[in-house]
Amino acid sequence: MAGMKEIRGKIKSVQNTRKITKAMEMVAASKMRRAQERMRAARPYADKVRAIAAHMSRANPEYRHPFMVANEGAKTAGIILVTTDKGLCGGLNTNVLRATVQKFKELEEKGQKVEATAIGSKGLGFLNRFGAKVLSQVVHLGDTPHLDKLIGAVKTQLDLYSEGKLSAVYIAYTRFVNTMKQEAVIEQLLPLSSEHFEADDGTPATSWDYIYEPDAQAVVDELLVRYVEALVYQAVAENMASEQSARMVAMKAASDNAKTVISELQLVYNKSRQAAITKELSEIVGGAAAV
């Protein structure tokens, strides 16, 4: 009977765990939908800023913003690492951290030092353990990221690049593909290549639906900073959508596994109970025969 009592305890424990993982799955599904909405809402802003900057850059080819000029003499590169603040999201962080380590090695093989900015507690902890130099950090963004909270940490990297101290700035994050698939990517943020401005809205460079003051240079300076900030925000938004999707899938898998374990334990319990009943019946029959 002690064995049956122990099995009942295990079944109860797994059932309680399944209730928790099921609740977390439902919460993650709700947060995932909101995160996807924020991710999609951020795209039109970045696209419009890019289109305007593209028009003005072509209209003023003699001016080159520092973000568009390669700092070939710099011996240090910057990486903005975007991870989550919480765990229980499968291999999401592991994949982007593995890609970041590979990028560190590639840059170091080229004679480049690496200085990092951490967005997310998991990435910050990893960089500290890895021994990387952390220039700036921002953690505990919550479920709704605000650009105001990101700007300070990101601006450190942008300022160093503008001063010619960084050869390039990369951003590592998890791109949202769909609910079941997310992929770790590392993209070059600076210098801005011509590819950033190739796909515009089809309006000729000499046609404008806006005016600017005091001059094109001042506007381009502001627009390019806003554009890079928008790219960072988009990466964070995609990472958050990926986080909630991965967490929902992980919790669903945990709930399904718990259900399987409960079924197996229930089978063991039934067999033990059947064996105990059979033994009691045998003892009763044996006693009656003796009488």
From Swiss-Prot:
The keyword Iron is assigned to this record: no
A GO molecular-function annotation: ATP binding
Family as reported in the entry's similarity comment: Belongs to the ATPase gamma chain family.
Membrane topology: Peripheral membrane protein
Function: Produces ATP from ADP in the presence of a proton gradient across the membrane. The gamma chain is believed to be important in regulating ATPase activity and the flow of protons through the CF(0) complex.
The organism of origin for this protein: Burkholderia lata (strain ATCC 17760 / DSM 23089 / LMG 22485 / NCIMB 9086 / R18194 / 383)
UniProt superkingdom: Bacteria
Keyword terms, alphabetized: ATP synthesis, Cell inner membrane, Cell membrane, CF(1), Hydrogen ion transport, Ion transport, Membrane, Transport
Keyword Cell inner membrane included in the entry's annotation: yes
Quaternary structure annotation from Swiss-Prot or TrEMBL: F-type ATPases have 2 components, CF(1) - the catalytic core - and CF(0) - the membrane proton channel. CF(1) has five subunits: alpha(3), beta(3), gamma(1), delta(1), epsilon(1). CF(0) has three main subunits: a, b and c.
Cellular-component GO terms for this entry: plasma membrane; proton-transporting ATP synthase complex
PANTHER family associated with the record: ATP SYNTHASE GAMMA CHAIN, ATP SYNTHASE SUBUNIT GAMMA, MITOCHONDRIAL
Subcellular location, principal: membrane
Subcellular locations according to the entry: Cell inner membrane
Signal peptide limits: none
Protein name: ATP synthase gamma chain
Matching InterPro entries: ATP_synth_F1_ATPase_gsu, ATP_synth_F1_gsu, ATP_synth_F1_gsu_CS
Single GO biological process annotation from the record: proton motive force-driven plasma membrane ATP synthesis
